[in-house]
Amino acid sequence: MKFGIEFVPDMKYYELEYYVKLAEDSGFDYTWITDHYNNRNVYSMLTILALKTRTIKLGPGVTNPYHISPALTASAIGTINEISGGRAVLGIGAGDKVTFERIGITWEKPLKRMREAVEIIRQLTEGKAVKYDGEIFKFNGAKLGFKPGSIPIYIGAQGPKMLQLAAELGDGVLINASHPKDFEVAKENIDAGLAKAGKSRDAFDTVAYASMSVDKDRDKARNAARIVVAFIVAGSPPTVLERHGLSEDAVNAVREALNNAFTKGDWGGVAKSVTDEMIDIFSISGTPDDVIERINELSKAGVTQVVAGSPIGPDKKKSIQLIGKEIIPKLK
């Protein structure tokens, strides 16, 4: 099992550098930095991390082909690959409709746009002159002035068609899920995409991009995950909620609690609205032994990399060290 860790660049650069170096020293293989317009620029932060780390692979988790051209993405991730000595990975997904609406971008044809963008980025990073007459993107001989080399591309996916696309075109898939049932459902579409491309599953990285919270005290770990889990529950599509047997009343209670938190500041009500069942479904939370048990279940469902996403734990530093000391050595 490979291990990744996600960070949001909502902190100062030196704080992010500290946590990523701590993760590297703790045995993590990958760090994924989120890419949102309202946070610090992902490639600026990745440049610092590339210079200050030695072994950890690093990249955006995830960027998108709407607010930045594939040509600029290829140049940016190619630069990170050069600076880091070949450690760059590119996470790219279709993005978030609500966020795009806030910045005046129309979210349309995500499958088509993703396919074209990934095909173009791969050609550019391999040093090719790109002639591409797509429905979305049209390139007429564009070429980077340097050759970054082969950079693994991971595609963020949830729905059946995007999962198939990720397996067909990508080196890995990033799936926002923490429960083995979600990966059992995804397996059929991943296998279909791999078969279409004539690729082996052994050469493909299936990533559980999970909410994780670890502490020696089980209750502290699980309570730290409640707010994050509330947002996941509120944003999950009906198919996912039905898959896990969550009642409409329970989900609506979480949504109402979040609304009260935003309007009245009642975040305690949000934590109370999240059931233990929801924590089990939408996060990997508990003691190191609890987390190991869940990761073993995910491995049986085809997962080959687990990403520790927010909140990581009640104390981020201690939780990273705990994962490195008591979880990673037992699963690698």
Curated annotation (Swiss-Prot):
The keyword Oxidoreductase applies. Its EC number is 1.5.98.2. CDD domains: Tetrahydromethanopterin_reductase (cd01097). It is found in: Cytoplasm. The keyword Nucleotide-binding does not apply. GO terms for molecular function: coenzyme F420-dependent N5,N10-methenyltetrahydromethanopterin reductase activity; oxidoreductase activity, acting on paired donors, with incorporation or reduction of molecular oxygen. One of its GO terms (biological process) is lactate metabolic process. It catalyses: 5-methyl-5,6,7,8-tetrahydromethanopterin + oxidized coenzyme F420-(gamma-L-Glu)(n) + H(+) = 5,10-methylenetetrahydromethanopterin + reduced coenzyme F420-(gamma-L-Glu)(n). Pfam families: Bac_luciferase. Pathway: Metabolic intermediate metabolism; lactate oxidation. GO terms for cellular component: cytoplasm. Keywords: Cytoplasm, One-carbon metabolism, Oxidoreductase. Belongs to the mer family. PANTHER family: 5,10-METHYLENETETRAHYDROMETHANOPTERIN REDUCTASE (PTHR43244:SF1), PTHR43244. Catalyzes the oxidation of methyl-H(4)MPT to methylene-H(4)MPT. This is 5,10-methylenetetrahydromethanopterin reductase. It comes from Archaeoglobus fulgidus (strain ATCC 49558 / DSM 4304 / JCM 9628 / NBRC 100126 / VC-16). The lineage of its organism: Archaea, Methanobacteriati, Methanobacteriota, Archaeoglobi, Archaeoglobales.
